[in-house]
Amino acid sequence: MEAIAKHRYARTSAQKARLVADQVRGLSVDKALNILTFSPKKAAALVKKVLESAIANAEHNEGADIDALRVATIMVDEGPSMKRIRPRAKGRADRILKRTAHITVVVSDAKAGR
């Protein structure tokens, strides 16, 4: 049994979100939530919300036991970048990339064999 949750266009860079995702990949959901709760990174709060959504999906849609769930897969892909302009001296301008990420979390019980 698997349950999936996604956060698309999350306002953080994929590189920063992957640092957090690597910490919780493969852990049980209670350990993962504990790590994400006390992490000082902005991306940790985003990943935590997606993980909580995946847990709720597993409980509501599949009737899964929350204690048996673990983080089977967590992926952070790049989303589109918003281009912005910062004016500089002598009429020049620099381009600012406001990056986004797509965060996908899959939780499964131990019987899934993943």
UniProtKB/Swiss-Prot annotation:
Domain of life: Bacteria
Single GO cellular component term: cytosolic large ribosomal subunit
Membrane-spanning segments: none
Gene Ontology annotations of biological process type: translation
MF terms in GO: rRNA binding; structural constituent of ribosome
InterPro entries associated with the record: Ribosomal_uL22 (IPR001063), Ribosomal_uL22_bac/chlpt-type (IPR005727), Ribosomal_uL22_bac/org-type (IPR047867), Ribosomal_uL22_CS (IPR018260), Ribosomal_uL22_sf (IPR036394)
Keywords, comma-separated and alphabetical: Ribonucleoprotein, Ribosomal protein, RNA-binding, rRNA-binding
SUPFAM superfamilies xref list: Ribosomal protein L22
A matching Pfam family: Ribosomal_L22
Complexes and interactors: Part of the 50S ribosomal subunit.
Record NCBIfam families: rplV_bact
Role of this protein: This protein binds specifically to 23S rRNA; its binding is stimulated by other ribosomal proteins, e.g. L4, L17, and L20. It is important during the early stages of 50S assembly. It makes multiple contacts with different domains of the 23S rRNA in the assembled 50S subunit and ribosome.
Family: Belongs to the universal ribosomal protein uL22 family.
The name this protein goes by in its record: Large ribosomal subunit protein uL22
Species of origin: Aeromonas hydrophila subsp. hydrophila (strain ATCC 7966 / DSM 30187 / BCRC 13018 / CCUG 14551 / JCM 1027 / KCTC 2358 / NCIMB 9240 / NCTC 8049)
Organism classification: Bacteria, Pseudomonadati, Pseudomonadota, Gammaproteobacteria, Aeromonadales
